[in-house]
């Protein structure tokens, strides 16, 4: 069936990590460690939940996770239970817990693709946008991510390897309140091309940088898709505040923590499916998009005209007013509305006298 929507629906993966805390008294939790919480910029006792999710821009589902301790032995309060059989999945999970998060990104993405989950992009925050990681992941899927300005993260432009702020200084910027200040094609350390766009922000330096390994898409689409990464932040908030992630258990066993996290993620996915099928009209698919397209095709002036026609019909039925008075009232309202929305100087269709 041919899609009735003028906008292409893009499926994508999103990956992010958040800090999960254990109860203060459970100091003997297996693999408990000091983990850095980026939101508070402090070290806390607990784990980091690295999550891979899937989204079509409307619904989000968690599809894989790793419950991470610290890769540094000095930051771990407790080690792996020596009684665990090394041939079991539980032991593999424990080995995964003491692996750097950047080393887990590729196997998580490969496993998701292997089981048949379709996505065109992987959207990431700046914590994972290391050039070497991007080069590894782009062998499997296109990457869209925010970039950090670090001295050893270099991008080749016109034969010179530049850090991000130096690259920005070389580019011609758009003036005024442009949504995109600059856009450029660069070469990554692996020799492959990527697009970097700079957008304005309120930070001291005045810009943020986004990278896409797919150089065929528009700059505006890169911004739109990166903005959809917010869904995974909502996922974490829902799991912590409403689905009782970590809060409903007191357990020392690492397998128990994995099982609990799996159940919380399953609850969220069930709620997402229920909302999509029972509440969200987008579950009607192309029928919804056809109706939505019809609504979008009505211009502001056409919509306002229809409202005025309805108001005129009500006035005729409810009050004994002459056509001259009714038209004067509607002309006054229309004039005020046009002035309010700043459309005085815009080309307008002649609506006066055409209210019937």
How should these model regions be labeled?
Residues 27-28, 59-61, 68-356:
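Single, function-defining residue in the core of a domain
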Residues 1-72:
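Active-site-proximal, Lys/Arg-enriched surface segment
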